[in-house]
């Protein structure tokens, strides 16, 4: 699972959950899969990102020295930061781990890079 995907996942479908975001991420196994840097693509995805979740993912991936805690206003003018953001979001692949609902504690496993977000009948 790419960390860009993590930024969009929520557990709001669980009965009684009001927000369900951001999910608590645990990484047990990850790999770096290099991809071509496209600054325009990174710029266009910025408005869709929740920066606190981006920074939280950076903390779990141990990349906080690369990503600031608060989104800079001039981020599109900072190509180095865009490259670091590209690395975090599109090159870090979570192979094994889990996502946890912040409201219920429900755990969703990540296996072979695929988060299992399926719910049981009694959870919907």
UniProtKB/Swiss-Prot annotation:
It is found in: Nucleus, Nucleoplasm; Cytoplasm, Perinuclear region. InterPro entries: Trm112, Trm112-like. Transmembrane segments: none annotated. GO terms for molecular function: protein heterodimerization activity; tRNA methyltransferase activator activity. Residues 2-120 form the TRM112 domain. Pfam families: Trm112p. Keywords: Cytoplasm, Nucleus. The keyword Oxidoreductase does not apply. The keyword Ligase does not apply. It comes from the Eukaryota. One of its GO terms (cellular component) is nucleoplasm. One of its GO terms (biological process) is maturation of SSU-rRNA. Belongs to the TRM112 family. Acts as an activator of both RNA and protein methyltransferases. Together with methyltransferase Mettl5, specifically methylates the 6th position of adenine in 18S rRNA. This is Multifunctional methyltransferase subunit TRM112-like protein. It comes from Drosophila melanogaster (Fruit fly).
């Amino acid at each position: 699972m790419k960390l860009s995907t993590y930024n969009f996942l929520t557990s709001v479908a669980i009965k009684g959950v009001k927000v369900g975001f951001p999910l608590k991420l645990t990484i047990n196994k990850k790999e770096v899969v290099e991809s071509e840097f496209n600054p325009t693509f990174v710029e266009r995805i910025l408005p869709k990102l929740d920066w606190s979740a981006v920074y939280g993912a950076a903390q779990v991936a141990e990349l906080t020295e690369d990503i600031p805690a608060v989104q800079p206003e001039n981020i599109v003018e900072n190509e180095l930061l865009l490259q670091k953001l590209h690395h975090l979001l599109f090159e870090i692949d979570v192979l094994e781990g889990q996502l946890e609902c912040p409201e219920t504690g429900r755990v969703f496993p990540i296996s072979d890079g695929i988060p299992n977000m399926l719910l049981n009948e009694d959870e919907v």
